[in-house]
Regions:
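Acidic catalytic motifs of isoprenoid enzymes
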Residues: 1-172
Length: 172
């Protein structure tokens, strides 16, 4: 976790994923901590109901720019902690952007009563894209990894949605 900003280290170490990630070999562990940290940051932005939608959208746009800079050699700003994982495991920019785009769907409220195709797109962005990043870290063959990410990501995200349905209904 040495590449992670201090405040992010606390969030990662407090996560239920921490114990599982902690037993990975150091390069994979550090990469997974970075991926988790990124996901946590953009999810927190999307979920911050105290901030106006416009501010949350602007913060997500800033992250899009930082991710782009990470791949073009520009100033990646806060996203700089991802650089070691991106370079070592050849993580794809499109997957990071997909995660941000999924969070944007939360901000824009596109998933309150989605069509099947919108729900599928949302699951791809917020779950399968994370899976695609993860299978690269684990060294899985590309086609098999993409297939696994596709199905497992959707299954896990739909389970997450169903698990939270009562809580979400109470919120409105």
């Amino acid at each position: 976790m040495s590449d992670l900003p201090e405040q992010l280290r606390a969030k990662v170490s407090g996560s239920s994923f921490y114990a599982g990630m902690r037993i990975l070999p150091k390069p994979e562990r550090e990469a997974m901590f970075a991926i988790y940290g990124f996901c946590r940051i953009v999810d927190d932005i999307a979920d911050d109901e105290t901030a106006p939608r416009t501010a949350r959208a602007a913060a997500l746009d800033q992250w899009r720019g930082q991710i782009a800079a990470l791949y073009t050699g520009g100033d990646a700003g806060e996203a700089g902690f991802l650089a070691p994982a991106v370079h070592r495991f050849r993580l794809e920019q499109a997957d990071f952007i997909a995660v941000i785009d999924g969070m944007q769907m939360d901000v824009d409220d596109y998933i309150r009563w989605p069509s099947y195709s919108t729900l599928d797109l949302y699951c791809d962005r917020v779950a399968s894209a994370v899976g695609r990043l993860s299978v690269r870290v684990f060294g899985m063959e590309r086609d098999a990894g993409i297939d696994l990410s596709h199905h497992l990501g959707r299954a896990l995200q739909l389970t997450n949605i169903l698990r939270d349905i009562d809580e979400d209904a109470a919120i409105g």
